[in-house]
Amino acid sequence: MKKHIFLSCLSVSLISCGPSSKEAIFYNDGIMGIVNKVTVAQNNFFDQTDGHNIDSLVICQKLYAQKSKESLDEIAKLNAFANKTGYLDAAKVFVNTLNSLANNEAKQMVEIMTKDTSSVTELDIKTVSDLSDKLNKETDEATKLIEDAQQQFVKEWKFELDHNHDKKHYKH
């Protein structure tokens, strides 16, 4: 009987402990997988903005918009971790920001950059430059927000990100 009571108390105490560091790592990997999908697509778009290959620019902008939409759908399916939403909220802001940039500023840049070169004006060039600056600024702000939230999450759940490897290794 004493053994049964002990095991019951032990199982209740283990259940009430909440998520483990390993579960936090898994959650982090899920969020970062979604974030990285849209980040890679945005970087591919940026790589094509030199104007040398207009077809690639158009394709990369469409892929950027598609990946950002997919990321929005995926991030919307995630739940809070241990009833805390800070990290998830930052990820949602990040993905929403990149989605908006893909469908507005990046799209406007492509519309201008795909014009016949003889019809491109100085105002068009300035507009592309301004749009590019806005893309960079808003991406940097969203990146800082999610990086700060990730660091807080890592600290709270007591694991470390090891950025010295191609694949992240975690210490807990």
Each PLM stretch: what is its role?
Residues 1-27:
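Bacterial Sec-dependent N-terminal signal peptides
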Residues 17-66, 163-172:
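Immediate post-signal-peptide N-terminus of mature secreted/exported proteins
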Residues 24-29, 86-97:
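Short, charge/polar-rich alpha-helical segments
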Residues 31, 57, 61-64, 68, ...:
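Hydrophobic packing residues in well-ordered alpha-helices of helical domains and bundles
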Residues 34-41, 64-74, 101-108:
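Amphipathic, well-ordered alpha-helical segments in soluble domains
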Residues 44-47, 70-83, 119-129:
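Short, charged/polar, low-complexity loop and linker segments
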Residues 71-93, 107-113:
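Short, solvent-exposed, charged loop/turn and helix-capping segments
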Residues 91-172:
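Extracytoplasmic electrostatic interaction patches
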